[in-house]
A protein has these predicted regions:
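Pre-Walker A adenine-sensing motif
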Residues: 2-37, 49
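Structural motif
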Residues: 61, 101-103
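Intrinsically disordered, low-complexity regions
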Residues: 19, 79, 83, 119-121
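Conserved P-loop
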Residues: 26-91
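Short, Lys/Arg-enriched charge-dense amphipathic segments
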Residues: 47, 56, 103-111
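Charged/polar, solvent-exposed surface patches and flexible loops
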Residues: 8, 12, 16, 50, ...
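Short, structured coil/loop segments at alpha-helix boundaries
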Residues: 3, 21-22, 64, 76, ...
Length: 140
């Protein structure tokens, strides 16, 4: 698959997602792994990175510290706005006033305690399963 096709797919997802986001406080975004050049690129993580780059008042949460570090090194402009679940409570609560959008990678890993901290209700669409990675964007 050509790289411009991948970028086009990501752009389509972002455009569609933002249109839906304007009409709702909570957005669930389905995405899939993009395969190209014999490798794999996570569609949902790539979409999250693109949204973080576009919206300076957004905060990103990923599964592990190593993923957060790798993304931060690759994209220094979003380094101070991407965190792992381990640092989630202090990262989010300590800077809540700074951010008006939270982008969460693999939302199904959240616990009820995390849900209470975010002050949101986790709703999973019937079309999604726990095997499908997705992103939640929440307006504070």
């Amino acid at each position: 698959m050509m790289i411009d096709t991948i970028e086009s797919q990501i752009e389509d997802v972002i455009t569609c997602s933002l249109a839906r986001y304007l009409n709702s406080n909570t957005l669930y975004l389905k995405s899939r792994t993009i395969r190209y050049n014999g490798g794999r690129q996570s569609g949902h993580t790539t979409t999250m990175i693109e949204l973080l780059k576009r919206y300076p008042n957004s905060l990103g949460l990923v599964n592990t510290h190593s993923i957060a570090m790798r993304i931060g090194k690759t994209y220094p402009d979003i380094n101070n706005r991407i965190f792992s679940w381990v640092s989630f409570p202090c990262a989010f609560l300590g800077s809540r006033s700074r951010f008006n959008m939270v982008i969460i990678d693999d939302m199904h890993r959240m616990s009820k305690d995390d849900e209470k901290l975010l002050d949101i209700e986790i709703l999973i669409s019937p079309v999604m399963t726990h095997d499908e990675p997705f992103v939640l964007i929440k307006l504070q």
